[in-house]
């Protein structure tokens, strides 16, 4: 196929998708929410199947890294390794990969999947708070009211003695809440000019690469490392499923930020909360 024919195909595809463009951010928001909501239940399955937190996070990142590398090679998209690109990978790795994944894995074995999903509602609240404090969004009384209502809702989840079946889970809810806090900072980070020109698959590859490099010694030192079984069992399929979800959802998330901004994209946290609770009820 000639270059002109390929260009015509792209133009034809663009024309076919044009009527859907106004709805695309909403469609992505729903898809991300359903996918990330399932991720908590998959993490719970992996823990129940014998996985250990640091080891689970490590293998999940390795799987995501390998898949992104293969896709980039097939699409002939060379992965940049400049000083600025590496700095971007490291920052996203800390904010969206190694720290959040480890926190969620630790909490998954001690807190119901639905409860962990509820903590994700923190993401849009904190994203809005950060954006307004940095002057990127105008203050709104309605949005501020929503922010305070969200904070009260989280407090109602952990403070009353009857809110949880086991009060020993309270500290682990706070550990789980570290993940959405870091994700909120990453939402703002992804809007920086130095991030704008990077392909989502490159960002995912780099973040998971450096995340896996960080978690490898931690997994070995803590005794959390474990070999993968072949053929795959529940543990391996759960980790592989989470890796696929994270790749697809992160690509959709960056696309949504580019189309509608970080505040809109962060609203997927509410869908994650609802779908996470439903997935937890269905699967457990």
Residue ranges and their predicted role:
Residues 17-20, 27, 61, 142, ...:
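C-terminal-most transmembrane helix of multi-pass membrane proteins
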Residues 56-59, 97, 101, 114-122, ...:
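Helix-helix packing/entry segments at the starts of transmembrane helices
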Residues 29, 84-92, 139-151, 172, ...:
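Cytoplasmic-side transmembrane-helix entry/capping segments in multi-pass membrane proteins
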Residues 48-99, 126-127, 182-186, 204-224, ...:
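Transmembrane alpha-helices of multi-pass small-molecule transport proteins
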Residues 10-58, 106, 165-192, 213, ...:
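Glycine-/small-residue-enriched transmembrane alpha-helix faces in small-molecule transporters
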Residues 41-50, 109, 158-169, 220-237:
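Membrane-interface helix termini and inter-helical loops of multi-pass transporters
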Residues 35-40, 69-120, 156, 242-260:
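Specific transmembrane alpha-helical segments of multi-pass solute transporters/efflux pumps
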Residues 68, 139-161, 215, 270, ...:
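Hydrophobic transmembrane alpha-helices of multi-pass small-molecule transport proteins
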């Amino acid at each position: 196929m000639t270059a002109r024919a390929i260009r015509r195909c792209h133009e034809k595809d663009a024309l076919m998708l044009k009527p859907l463009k106004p709805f695309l951010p909403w469609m992505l928001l729903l898809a991300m929410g359903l996918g990330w909501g399932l991720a908590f239940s998959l993490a719970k399955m992996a823990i129940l199947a014998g996985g250990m937190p640091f080891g689970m996070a490590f293998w999940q990142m390795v799987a995501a890294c390998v898949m992104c590398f293969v896709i980039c090679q097939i699409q002939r998209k060379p992965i940049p390794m400049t000083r600025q690109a590496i700095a971007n990978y490291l920052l996203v790795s800390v904010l969206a990969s190694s720290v959040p994944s480890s926190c969620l894995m630790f909490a998954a074995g001690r807190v119901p999947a639905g409860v962990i999903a509820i903590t994700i509602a923190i993401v849009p609240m904190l994203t809005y708070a950060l954006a307004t404090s940095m002057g990127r969004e105008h203050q709104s009384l309605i949005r501020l009211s929503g922010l305070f209502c969200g904070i009260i809702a989280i407090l109602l989840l952990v403070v009353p003695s009857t809110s949880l079946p086991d009060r020993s889970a309270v500290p682990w809810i706070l550990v789980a809440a570290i993940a959405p806090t870091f994700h909120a900072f990453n939402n703002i980070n992804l809007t920086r000019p130095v991030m704008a020109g990077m392909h989502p698959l490159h960002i995912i590859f780099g973040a998971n690469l450096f995340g896996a490099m960080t978690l490898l010694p931690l997994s070995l030192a803590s005794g959390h490392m474990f070999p993968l079984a072949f053929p795959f069992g529940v543990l391996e399929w759960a980790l592989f499923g989470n890796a696929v979800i994270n790749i697809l959802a992160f690509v959709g998330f960056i696309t949504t930020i580019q189309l509608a901004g970080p505040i809109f994209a962060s609203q997927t946290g509410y869908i994650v909360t609802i779908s996470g609770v439903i997935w937890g009820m269905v699967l457990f």
